Each structure stands twice: as C-alpha cells, then as structure tokens.
From Swiss-Prot:
Species assigned in the record: Escherichia coli O157:H7
Lineage: Bacteria, Pseudomonadati, Pseudomonadota, Gammaproteobacteria, Enterobacterales
Subcellular location as annotated: Fimbrium
Chief site of localization: other
Role of this protein: Part of the ecpRABCDE operon, which encodes the E.coli common pilus (ECP). ECP is found in both commensal and pathogenic strains and plays a dual role in early-stage biofilm development and host cell recognition. Tip pilus adhesin, which is required for assembly of EcpA into fibers.
Record keyword Signal present: yes
The name this protein goes by in its record: Fimbria adhesin EcpD
Induction entry: Negatively regulated by H-NS. Positively regulated by IHF and EcpR.
Family according to the record: Belongs to the EcpD/MatE family.
Subunit structure: Forms polymers. Interacts with EcpA.
GO-annotated cellular components: pilus
Signal peptide range: 1-23
Keywords from the UniProt entry: Fimbrium, Receptor, Signal
Length: 547
C-alpha cells in the first residue's frame, strides 16, 4: 500500500510541472474603439464602391472595391495603392514569415474578408491585387495568411464585395458594431485543415470592438446621356446631336462650351468634412501640359468656376452638400490644343475623369470616377459619327420570340462633316454570328452558354428617292453602302472663311422576333428561358479629291 502510494505521488510530481509550463497564444482585449463615421460612394457610372473616413482614420474602414485609373502600376505618381480594408485602430505590424488570421464576431455580413491587405508596390505584395491570399476563408474571416518578406505589412483585412453591399444598403445615420480578432504566430499551422492561430502554442491575439456610423451616401448617377461636339481647326465647338446639358459660354475672356458632366445625390447625417476633395483631371499628359489652368474649369452651379490644376483647386465635401451636379467648361483653346496634339474622335470618358482625394487617408483615400454624361468630340473637317437616336451610349431592347411578336428595333443618327459631302459612306454590324444555310445570323446565348439561338437582322434607311433600302445584316462584320441615303445638309463656315457642310441621316437596325429559325438553337434543339447578345454598329466615310 505504501509503495503504491509513493509511486502515485512520484507520478503526480512528474506530471504537474509539464501541465504548469504549457505555453499558449497571448490574448489582449483592448478597450472599445471610439465610434467612427464614414462616407460611402455608390458609383453607378463605373459600377463600383468606395468607402472613406468622415473624420478620424482609425479604426480603419477605407478604400474602393475595384481598381480605378489611378491604380499604381510601378511608375509615375502613386495614388491608389490598395483596395479597401479594415483594422482595429492600432495598425499593428506583422512579422515576416509568421502566419496571420483575422475574423469578425458579430459581423454585419457573411464572408466579410478575403485576405491580408498590403500596399501593392511593396516587396512581397501582389501588384495586381494588393492581397496576400490566406490558406482558407469562412463566414467570419480568413486564416493562415503567410506574411511575406519585404515591405511592411499590418493587421489589415481586405473587404469582400459582400461587405460593400452591406454598407450600400445601410441607411444614413445607422451604425454597426463588430468585434475584430487579429492573431499572428510563428507556428507553421495548416489552416486549410482547421488549425487556427488562436490555438497555437505561441503568438499574439488581439480583440477589439469597433463601431462605424454611415454619415453620408454619395450616389454618382449614370444618366447615359450623350452629345456630339464638332470642333474646327481653331477649336471653336459646334454642338451636334445629343441631349447632354451643354451650352456655349464665355467665362472672363475665354469662350467655349460648358456641360453638366456629373449628376449626384448626397445624403448626410449633418457630417461636416473638409478633408474630402473632388476635382477633374485630364487623362492625356501632353494635353494637360499644353492647356492653361483656365482653359478647363469646373463648377457646382454653372456660374462660379474654379480652374483645373492638379490638386490645387477642388470642391470639398461640405461644398458638395449644397449641390447635385458638377459642370465643366472647355475653352476654345482647350479644343484647339486637342487638334494640335492630334487628339480627335475621342470620348470624354477617355479624355478626363474626376478624382476623389481624402487627405485623412493617404494610402487608400484616392479614387476616380467617370462622368455621368458623355461627349463625343470630333473634328468638323472630315469626320463621321453614329449615335443612338435615344442619345444613350448603350441602347438595349428585350422581347419575346414567337409568331406575331414585335421586332427589336434600334434607331441611329449618322452624321458626316467635311468641306463637301462624303463620296462614300459605309455601315456594318458586328457581334456573335453564325452562318446557317448560307445566311449569317446574329447569335444570342444563355448565361451558361448552353443555348445559342440564331436571329436574322437587317439594316434599313430611306434613300434620296424616298424608297426604303434594306440590307440583310446578320452581325456578319461586312460593310454595306449607304451613300445614297436621304441626307439633311447644314452648311457651315469656318472662322478662316472656309466653307463646308454637315450631313445627317437615320438608319434602323432591326432584329425580328417572329422568324421560325429562332424557335430552335443553332444545334437544332428546342429551347426556353432567356438569351442575350451585344454588338456594335460601325460607320466609315471617304472623301476623294479634296484639296
């Protein structure tokens, strides 16, 4: 008995120190972070989102869910250098080659994070994504992201699209609170097999409650409005077809054209902010250098103007609260410099954009958005254009297939401008196509690509003799002659005294819905459901023997 007892005591003495010295991750629970306000940008022109601090930066909820034209790609000025992310407010650094988990409790959305956010041009980060992928993700967060060597990395989690969609639907003035868990360890665990940082023998685990309030929602509206502008060699603009809100205007000693280029709504909870700046920027560096600051100006009301000069002039968030539009003025010298630089046949969406800078968040406070309206700028000497007669960039139709169903009709306006009428004008339709029985058909497909349905298509216009000419178009990428269309001529005189003319006509692209061939697929199978297609209509004009 005594021997057995002694043995038991010895065993107990040997086991006890092992239990007492077992290591674990160090867990720190921080005091709740102060509530922070954010501004949410809903960009319907470019189909993306942006979130930015309305006041203090930390804890962070900042950045866009998509790259813009300001993305840094390794050269030039550094603007947008990561996508949107969150942190707990301490901006804690990470150790190279350690592993990192971040997960949320009381998350406002399922699957809120995609991985470890990093600055895209730092060594060890992905220039394309600004993301270090974890071993796995779940409905709460991500796990097993290896901290790469090179530039600094912090406890930042990249936001998922689901998180942005939640922020979008939040009413202005509402708040959410979540618990951010951030854990790093030197232990090389396998998160894909279920292991987690918090369960390892060493490391640091931080826990903090953060609260964010939606202080404002800026909705950028895509009006799809379209207008043509023809410019002569001296830069004098002439408005063509379109419904964009444009007018000729003189500001000081400069004459030119002003247009309402951005439409927006801004709802706030009374937030006051002057760190958010909005201003336009010319995309073409040569043109930006050639024009003066006052050759391009912008305004919130169309009457008081600011020059465009990089970041020097801007409107603040507070100033934008009293308006719902941004106007842009282009002087004749602006257009003249376009001619001198060889810039023609250009869309304003490719010519300039608006920039959004929040000086509070230098790494993720840059954003860019397109205009709500579009101007098609063309030279008045020897040019051709085609626009929808609805004055929209992307006209669309929908219908049903079957006997007696109406065709999908699209109307267009074709304009030529030159010293004389064009000697030849051609038109063609491009899109998904297939030849069946010697005839080309436009092909519409289901979302999964399994159903491909043929549709005939035609181009038609009124000739100068009053007859309707119809071509079988079939999306076949073949030119058809429309020189003999009925053109409406308007003469013009250049500032130099040279004369010319602008000629306009209309053309209709039609897709019948009642042709029997469209009841079956290209593989001769029956089908049901929805199919769709997109394509383009191109025009070209030729002038001969012009001195």
């Amino acid at each position: 008995m005594r021997v057995n007892l002694l043995i038991a005591m010895i065993i107990f003495a040997l086991i006890w120190p092992v239990t007492a010295l077992r290591a674990a991750v160090s867990k720190t629970t921080w005091a709740d972070a102060p509530a922070r306000e954010f501004v949410f940008v809903e960009n319907n022109s470019d189909d993306n989102f942006f979130v930015t601090p309305g006041g203090a930066l930390d804890p962070r909820l900042t950045g866009a869910n998509r790259w813009t034209g300001l993305k840094y790609n390794g050269s030039g000025t550094i603007y947008q250098q990561s996508l949107g992310y969150i942190d707990n407010g301490y901006n804690t650094g990470l150790y190279t080659n350690w592993k990192f988990d971040m997960w949320l409790e009381n998350s406002p959305v399922s699957s809120p994070l995609t991985g470890l956010r990093c600055i895209n041009w730092y060594a060890g980060c992905n220039m394309t994504t600004s993301l270090i992928l974890p071993q796995t993700t779940d409905t709460s967060g991500f796990y097993g992201a290896t901290v790469t060597s090179g530039g600094a990395k912090w406890m930042h989690g990249m936001l998922s699209d689901a998180f942005y969609q939640y922020l979008q639907q939040m009413p202005v003035g509402s708040s959410f609170t979540m618990t951010i868990n951030a854990c790093q360890t030197s232990v090389n665990y396998d998160a894909s097999s279920g292991a987690r940082c918090k369960d390892q023998a060493s490391g640091n685990w931080y826990v903090r409650n953060v609260t964010h309030t939606k202080a404002a929602n800026l909705r950028l509206i895509n009006t799809h409005s379209l207008a043509e502008v023809f410019i002569n060699s001296d830069g004098v603009p002439t408005l063509g077809e379109g419904n964009a809100d444009c007018r000729t205007q003189t500001i000081g000693s400069r004459s030119g054209l002003s247009c309402k280029m951005v439409n927006y709504t801004l709802q706030t909870n009374g937030l006051s902010n002057t760190s958010i700046h909005i201003f336009p920027a010319i995309a073409n560096s040569s043109l930006a250098s050639a024009v003066g600051a006052y050759d391009m100006q912008f305004s919130l009301n169309g009457s008081s103007w600011k020059p465009v000069s990089n970041t020097a002039y801007y409107y603040t968030f507070n100033e934008m609260k009293s308006a719902d539009s941004i106007y842009v003025f282009f002087s004749s010298n602006f257009f003249k410099q376009m001619v001198n630089q060889g810039i023609s046949d250009i869309n304003t969406k490719d010519l300039f954009n608006f920039r959004f800078q929040n000086t509070t968040s230098p790494e993720s406070g840059w954003y860019e958005f397109s205009t709500s309206n579009t101007l098609i700028i063309k030279p008045r000497d020897f040019s051709i254009s085609i626009i929808s007669d609805e004055y929209t960039q992307t006209p669309s139709r929908e219908g049903y297939v079957g006997s007696g169903e109406s065709a999908l009709d699209f109307g267009y306006i074709v304009t030529t401008s030159g010293k004389t009428a064009a000697d030849e004008v051609l038109i063609k339709v491009t899109g998904p196509a297939q030849v069946i029985g010697g005839r080309s058909y436009c092909v519409f497909s289901s979302d999964d690509g399994k159903a491909k349905v043929p549709f005939p298509a035609t181009l038609s216009f009124i000739t100068r003799n009053g007859a309707t000419k119809t071509y079988d178009a079939g999306c076949d990428d073949s030119w058809r002659d429309m020189t003999d269309a009925l053109w409406l001529t308007t003469p013009w005189t250049d500032i130099s005294g040279e004369v010319g003319q602008m000629d306009k006509t209309t053309v209709k692209f039609s897709i019948p819905m009642d042709n029997a061939i469209s009841l079956r697929t290209v593989d001769d199978n029956g089908w049901f459901g929805e199919v769709s297609a997109s394509g383009e209509i191109h025009v070209q004009a030729t002038w001969r023997n012009i001195n």
